[in-house]
From Swiss-Prot:
Residues 398-409, 432-441, 540-557 have a biased composition (Basic and acidic residues). Glycans are attached at N351, N363, N515, N539, N546. Belongs to the bZIP family. This is bZIP transcription factor 49. The gene is BZIP49. Residues 109-135, 352-364, 447-460, 508-519 have a biased composition (Polar residues). GO terms for molecular function: DNA binding; DNA-binding transcription factor activity. Residues 211-218 are annotated as: Leucine-zipper. It comes from Arabidopsis thaliana. It holds the Pfam family bZIP_1.
Length: 620
């Protein structure tokens, strides 16, 4: 079909612009354009742009590459299918042209709205159109061949930019959404990379600052270690260095020889200390602590059992085995006849001197605390028996003084003069004390045989009161019936022997003066045996001393029987009315009397007391 050539009288183009290929409008139909067509007009350009908005993938021909323009393009005139209308303005001319512009095949469909000329003008122009059907057919075939070759070449190079007219709206929307999403993701990824790089830079800076600080500290420590090593080396240096030796063959002056080792301080090499030494020290400390604690525990354990009392009374032989305790006061026998060369003006009731009494001084009015267990009615009865020991000692002194009694007084009178009170009265001048003291003394014979003389007792009482020394050893009544043989029963007895554990009688006074070197002391303490018995006679650990004691015991003359103590049952005693003495209104029904027979045997009797008007014996 021949295409008519349209000669536009209204538009005048220069010769330079006649053959320039102008890109057609991207709109599908300009006359029927609306909002949807305008919105989708951009999607017709099938240029795929990267996220970084670069045109690296686009193909641009080089300068030497020629455009794909057909050779007869210069002779070609603008032609198109023209359909005349009936003189109505705004006729649409649908012109479909296919041109090869810059090697790109473009298919456009455009609508031109122009003023329709008058009928006269249109007739003039139609006459000037020339139809050449053969030329147009040839031109179409050439254009198709060129376009196929060009598309084939672009496919090989990996670039095909063919814009198709009309597409589905869904595909266009998806492409737009994908493009926006890609751009946003690219922007976010760039921001993340930027922040990550900034954080890495901050960390690197911090690491560099930390490394610099550590290096400075290390250098400081090294320098300090070097100074300390130098100080230690100078402190323990053996002496100045040796002077360099000048050898005779050296023609030049002597030079300093470099000593062994380098002058530069070496870095300290840490050495691990052996662990076994520390373990040994800890083990030694543990053993020492355990031993100390064990020693202290033993001291506390055995210290509580051992009675540590320096200078106190030590129980003697039989008293430990027979009697429970013996804490009573020791009687002091002190007179001019007992001591060899002693002072005659010393009183009977003086205390022991400080050199002889190692224990603390006691009050003379302190009550005697002692006990004696006696079998009675198939039971053991506890009796206050502290006076037995003192009675034995008093009897020994009485027998010694009996041989040298020039005035011919009885044994009991001599004993009462030489004994100090065991239980003193607080005040002898008070009427009540004087009334009680009348019933405290009697002779030994009268107490045993219930027959005696009142004159002897009266003389004894008068002499005692006249001297001011009220003896309170026996607490018996002066008047009234006394004991009979049917009223007393023997409880137990024990002999005085020289064997270990027995009571040894005192030797005569003449032998004590001859055998004792300490004869100038005026006070005698029988508790610590200071002069009462010779040292050689009292030592029972050696056989010769035991034999000498036996000889002295055999030489001792048996004396008459005497009462050494009178004991009462503490269960039958009442509370004392007078301070410091045994007394009470409750009468006693039974007493225990200790008698020394022939100076070698002590017999304890249990006697039943009669019930007179006046109580004979009072106890606390």
């Amino acid at each position: 079909m021949a295409e008519p050539v349209l000669e536009d009288t209204y538009l005048t183009f220069s010769s330079d612009f006649d053959y320039i290929a102008i890109a057609p409008s991207p709109f599908d139909n300009f006359c029927n354009s609306n909002s949807d067509q305008v919105r989708n007009s951009i999607s017709d350009l099938r240029f795929l742009i990267d996220d970084d908005d670069s045109f690296d993938d686009l193909y641009f021909p080089s300068e030497n590459e020629s455009f794909c323009i057909p050779p007869d393009a210069t002779k070609r005139e603008m032609s198109g299918d023209f359909t005349p209308a009936s003189g109505i303005s705004g006729d649409c001319v649908n012109e479909d042209t296919e041109k090869n512009t810059n090697g790109v095949l473009i298919s456009t469909s455009s609508c031109y709205n122009r003023e329709s000329p008058t009928d006269s003008d249109f007739s003039g122009t139609s006459q000037s159109l020339s139809f050449s059907g053969q030329d147009s057919a040839k031109r179409k075939t050439e254009i198709e061949e060129d376009s196929s070759d060009e598309s084939r070449r672009l496919g090989k190079d990996g670039f095909a930019s063919v814009i198709k007219v009309g597409g589905e709206e869904d595909d266009e929307k998806k492409k737009n959404v994908r493009l926006v999403r890609n751009r946003e993701s690219a922007h976010l990824s760039r921001q993340r990379k930027k922040h990550y790089v900034e954080e890495l830079e901050d960390k690197v800076k911090n690491m560099h600052s930390t490394i610099s600080e550590l290096s400075s500290k290390m250098s400081y420590f090294v320098a300090e270690n070097v100074t300390l090593r130098q100080q230690m080396g100078t402190r323990f240096s053996s002496g100045p260095p040796m002077v360099p030796i000048v050898y005779p063959w050296m023609q030049y002056p002597a030079y300093m020889v470099k000593p062994q080792g380098s002058q530069v301080a070496l870095l300290p090499i840490p050495r691990l200390k052996p662990k076994h030494s520390v373990a040994k020290v800890k083990k030694f400390k543990k053993v020492a602590s355990f031993s100390v604690f064990g020693f202290l525990f033993c001291m506390f354990l055995f210290g509580a059992l051992v009675n540590i009392s320096y200078g106190e009374y030590k129980s003697n032989y039989v008293t430990d085995g027979v009697y429970d305790q013996s804490r009573g006061r020791v009687l002091v026998v002190d007179s001019s006849r007992v001591h060899c060369g002693g002072d005659s003006d010393q009183g009977v009731g003086r205390n022991v001197s400080e050199t002889e009494n190692l224990g603390p001084p006691r009050n003379s009015s302190e009550p005697l605390v002692a006990s004696l267990f006696v079998p009675r009615n198939e039971k053991l009865v506890k009796i206050d028996g502290n006076l037995i020991i003192h009675s034995v000692l008093a009897s020994e002194k009485a027998r010694d003084s009996e041989t040298k009694n020039e005035e011919g007084k009885s044994v009991l009178a001599t004993t009462t003069k030489t004994l100090s009170p065991a239980l003193p009265l607080p005040d002898s001048t008070s009427p009540r004390t004087r009334d009680v003291s009348k019933h405290l003394y009697s002779e030994t014979g009268k107490g045993l045989s219930s027959s005696g003389s009142d004159d002897a007792s009266n003389d004894q009482l008068k002499s005692t009161i006249a001297n001011g020394k009220m003896q309170q050893w026996f607490r018996e009544g002066v008047a009234g019936p006394m004991f009979s043989s049917g009223m007393c029963t023997e409880v137990f007895q024990f002999d005085v022997s020289s064997n270990s554990g027995a009571i040894i009688p005192a030797s005569p006074h003449t032998q004590q003066c001859k055998n004792t070197s300490d004869t100038q002391k005026g006070k005698k303490n029988r508790r610590i045996l200071s002069g009462g018995l010779p040292v050689s006679d009292f030592n029972l650990t050696k056989e010769d001393h035991n034999s000498s004691s036996k000889d002295k015991f055999r030489e001792t003359k048996p004396g008459p029987s005497m009462v050494v103590s009178v004991l009462v049952d503490p269960r039958e005693g009442g509370n004392g009315d007078i301070d410091g003495m045994m007394g009470g209104t409750k009468p006693q029904s039974r007493v225990f009397i200790v008698v020394l027979v022939d100076g070698v045997k002590y017999i304890t009797y249990s006697c039943v007391l009669p019930r007179p008007d006046v109580p004979h014996l009072m106890t606390s």
